[in-house]
Amino acid sequence: MKILVVNAGSSSLKYQLLDMKDESVIAKGNCDRIGIDGHVSAKTGDGRHIEEDCNFPTHTEAFEKLVEVLTSGETKVIDSMSEISAVGHRIVQGAEVFKETCLVTDEVIDQIDALAELAPVHNHPHALALRACKAVIPAGTPQVVVFDTAFHSTMPRKAYLYGLPYECYTDLHVRKYGFHGTSHRFVSGELARVCLLYTSDAAD
């Protein structure tokens, strides 16, 4: 099973293609400086590598380049995007709308785009990348969005409200959301695993 992982930033589009039977990296790269003087860097798991300047007016063109480097030329690793079993996208801001990972639909993309007021540098590029991916991935291929804010969604109100007029929260949605939740989830999971191993060893 091959999984494509995408991280669309404000002016970049990073990706990794993983072989999930051993979680090895088949290919990875970055379309950088989107909207300026674009540049692509791509590398395969067996060491093939390209660096070239490209024109990326938007994340849509960057995603088209991503497809090109995966399916053709010196960095070709698949014959077509149909070889990809699923796609995962990292999304910065889920606000109070998205509290867990979910499948991508047109409605989900629209909601992510609408939350750009809370993450203006990130959420609109996320939506562009999602739409571009949806256009080139065969219909029926599951796409999943993972939100940085989801890990922190159980914060109590007394922790996430600021000492500001309450209307700042009710009208403008100004509150603490928490970020880098995917990293926090991984670290906390690893900590629990290591502590469990340690306590098991101590018991023996």
Residues of each region from the PLM?
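Short beta-strand-loop/turn "lid" adjacent to the catalytic site in phosphate-handling enzymes
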Residues: 70, 76-122, 142-144, 151-159
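Conserved phosphate-binding catalytic cores of ATP/NTP-utilizing and phosphoryl-transfer enzymes
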Residues: 124-136, 180-197
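A short acidic Gly-Thr/Ser loop motif
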Residues: 6-11, 34, 200
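Conserved small/polar residues in nucleotide/adenosyl-binding loops
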Residues: 198-204
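Short glycine-rich, Thr/Ser-proximal phosphate-binding strand/loop in the N-terminal lobe
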Residues: 12-56
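Extreme N-terminal starter segment of soluble prokaryotic enzymes
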Residues: 1-3
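Flexible, glycine/proline-enriched loop segments at strand-loop-helix junctions
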Residues: 112-123, 170-181
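Conserved active-site "lid/cap" helical segment
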Residues: 37-85, 129
